[in-house]
UniProtKB/Swiss-Prot annotation:
Pfam families: ACAS_N (PF16177), AMP-binding (PF00501), AMP-binding_C (PF13193). ATP binds at G387, E388, P389, D411, T412, W413, W414, Q415, T416, D500, R515, R526. InterPro entries: Ac_CoA_lig, ACAS_N, AMP-bd_C, AMP-bd_C_sf, AMP-binding_CS, AMP-dep_synth/lig_dom, ANL_N_sf. This is Acetyl-coenzyme A synthetase. It comes from Cronobacter sakazakii (strain ATCC BAA-894) (Enterobacter sakazakii).
Length: 652
């Protein structure tokens, strides 16, 4: 595999890069052999109120998982992203906002963003929100979403951003779990010309009898669409900030004070509230942003991720703003109203660094040269990829067509739980191979282990684990440290288990092969099969369901659901639509099954365990080697499923 074509470091990048190959080797060695010295130095990327003396205090030991970085230091995240830049670059653009409608865009300077954040911080305080309170944010991709997040950080409130594509039920579940006191939303969102009923979804979520903590809903007017109004509970954003002062003293936070909760899908049941704290997280977001994108002052940077995902937190907002960068926030989608929209935005705003997802790249690739019609993209210097492994064909297309064969593709592997990049090329230090995330970032110690946890040496394949902590690591799951230990540290002792498989080639480059647990990656978004199965089984006509992922040319994985109906119920076209809409309503559009496979029974072991391995193979049409079926209670089930599969229309 190491013989695959390598893309050399372009001369234009090598001339002015922040990290050379020699520097990478030296810094990496220092970072793993003396993390205190290395991260002690890197911590200076931020301004501290009380400087830290202790750098690393971490343990992955069973029953004693504890992660603390810079624990005696104090700082404020918003002050690091805004206040400290005012004297030197107050008039520089902090956020470029590009609307869904291309005629709408605006530039917000660091001074203006600081003013807006101070006003909203005072607004939050006037509503009784204080340090440690949880604020739920369910917003479209508008600058006010960033203002809300930064204002929470400024006063020490913990934000829980909920992706605008989630259903009222999913919103309610996240509010209940976090006991959020306030919800910040908009009347509607806008995406690909369609209105998204955000306020209505919040209203529906708050009707859930389990929601008892919410006192107010702050509503930003995005479209002016008709909405229900609950007097006393609902408050207009514009009216609140009008009354608020533009002066606000940021609250001094300990490095280990909670910053945000972000819910992510797990392999079992309900979503997990991943908790990140202030100091280590921001050091890590800023250093990874700086080095992985080879950021130079004046660069225009565009990360296409929604603020509702961790990529939006770390690499649309906090990493870039901590470094004083200009970050572009895009309300729309890359191929609307035409296939070349993404390329048009690059040209319009002279974007130098573009960070997007393989799903978007594959969708554009399917359009061929229409994706770049009438554009030259000559401003681009660095390309990035995030969300799932990128297949070599899509990588090469992205490099060739979008980047004009001159921009390194920074293929980043990381997770909600890692806070920032774990395995990634550095533009001036890494020769690239299409489809490989290449080598670990500073301080990251990956290993590949077999199913018993034995480390595998050299070129090999295995479960991807990390053997020591890094500053951006999640500290716990909100309100459930036991589940945190169980999920990430119990499979392999004294190691963080990512849930991903990977292989390492002869050059030490890592290739991520995908999830090894029951988690799907659909369009770069994680969905737990258990979550989708629970939604299916809650339908009154469904007895049992098993969900697997199948390869999909655009989305990476599509959702294939095996469904057993209750006795006396018959499959029909109406029920097919009803069940798909049911899941959409329970979780959100992302989780809608692409295929429903009606069946009378599922392959189970004698102990009643569903054999998902077999279901995955049948769904993918890979029937050459179904493996050992002798443990099945009824081996005949497999034949029947294969027969039924013949008549099922598959998504392209």
């Amino acid at each position: 595999m190491s013989q695959i074509h390598k893309h050399p470091i372009p001369a234009a990048i090598a001339e002015r890069c922040l990290i050379t190959p020699e520097q990478y080797d030296a810094k990496y060695q220092q970072s793993v052999h003396d993390p205190d010295a290395f991260w002690g130095e890197q911590g200076k990327i931020l301004d501290w109120i009380t400087p830290y003396q202790t750098v690393k205090n971490t343990s992955f030991a069973p029953g004693n998982v504890s992660i603390k970085w810079y624990e005696d230091g104090t700082l404020n995240l918003a002050a690091n992203c805004l206040d400290r830049h005012l004297s030197e670059r107050g008039d520089q653009t902090a956020i470029i906002w590009e609307g869904d409608d291309a005629t709408q865009s605006k530039h917000i300077s660091y001074r203006e963003l600081h003013r807006d954040v101070c006003r909203f911080a005072n607004t939050l305080t006037s509503l009784g929100i204080k340090k440690g309170d949880v604020v739920a944010i369910y917003m479209p991709m508008v600058p006010e979403a960033a203002v809300a997040m930064l204002a929470c950080a400024r006063i020490g409130a913990v934000h829980s951003v909920i992706f605008g594509g989630f259903s009222p039920e999913a919103v309610a579940g996240r509010i209940i779990d976090s006991s959020a006191r306030l919800v910040i939303t908009a009347d509607e969102g806008v995406r690909a010309g369609r209105a998204i009923p955000l306020k209505k979804n919040v209203d529906d979520a708050l009707k859930n009898p389990g929601v008892t903590s919410v006192e107010h809903v702050v509503v930003f007017k995005r479209t002016g669409g008709n909405i229900e109004w609950h007097e006393g509970r609902d408050l207009w954003w514009s009216e609140l900030v009008k009354k608020a002062s533009a002066h606000h003293q940021p609250v001094e936070m300990n490095a280990e004070d909670p910053l945000f909760i972000l819910y992510t899908s797990g392999s079992t049941g309900k979503p997990k509230g991943v908790l990140h704290t202030t100091g280590g997280y921001l050091v890590y977001a800023a250093t990874t942003f700086l080095y992985a994108f080879d950021y130079h002052p004046g660069d225009i940077y565009w990360c296409t991720a929604d603020v509702g995902w961790v990529t939006g937190h770390s690499y649309l907002l906090y990493g870039p703003l901590a470094c004083g960068a200009t970050t572009l926030m895009f309300e729309g989608v890359p191929n609307w109203p035409s296939a070349n929209r993404m390329a048009q935005v690059v040209d319009k705003h002279k974007v130098n660094i573009l960070y997007t997802a393989p799903t978007a790249i594959r969708a554009l690739m399917a359009e061929g040269d229409k994706a770049i019609d009438g554009t030259d993209r000559s401003s681009l210097r660095i390309l990035g990829s995030v969300g799932e492994p990128i297949n070599p064909e899509a990588w090469e297309w992205y490099w060739k067509k979008i980047g004009n064969e001159k921009c390194p593709v920074i293929d980043t592997w990381w997770q909600t739980e890692t806070g920032g990049f774990m395995i990634t090329p550095l533009p001036g230090a890494t020769e690239l191979k299409a489809g490989s995330a290449t080598r670990p970032f500073f301080g990251v110690q990956p290993a590949l282990v077999d199913n018993e946890g034995n480390p595998q040496q050299g070129a090999t394949e295995g479960n991807l684990v990390i053997t020591d902590s890094w500053p951006g690591q999640a500290r716990t799951l909100f309100g459930d440290h036991e589940r945190f230990e169980q999920t990430y540290f119990s499979t392999f002792k004294n190691m963080y288990f990512s849930g991903d498989g990977a292989r390492r080639d002869e050059d030490g480059y890592y290739w991520i092969t995908g999830r090894v647990d029951d988690v799907l990656n659909v369009s770069g978004h994680r969905l737990g099969t258990a979550e989708i199965e629970s939604a299916l089984v809650s339908h009154p006509k469904i007895a049992e369901a098993a969900v697997v992922g199948i390869p999909h040319s655009i989305k990476g994985q599509a959702i294939y659901a095996y469904v057993t109906l209750n006795h006396g119920e018959e499959p029909s076209a109406e029920l097919y639509s009803e069940v798909r809409n049911w899941v959409r309503k329970e979780i959100g559009p992302l989780a809608t099954p692409d295929v429903l496979h009606w069946t009378d029974s599922l392959p189970k072991t004698r102990s009643g365990k569903i054999m998902r391995r077999i279901l995955r193979k049948i769904a993918a049409g890979d029937t050459s080697n179904l493996g050992d079926t002798s443990t099945l209670a009824d081996p005949g089930v497999v034949e029947k499923l294969l027969e039924e599969k013949q008549s099922i229309a598959m998504p392209s």
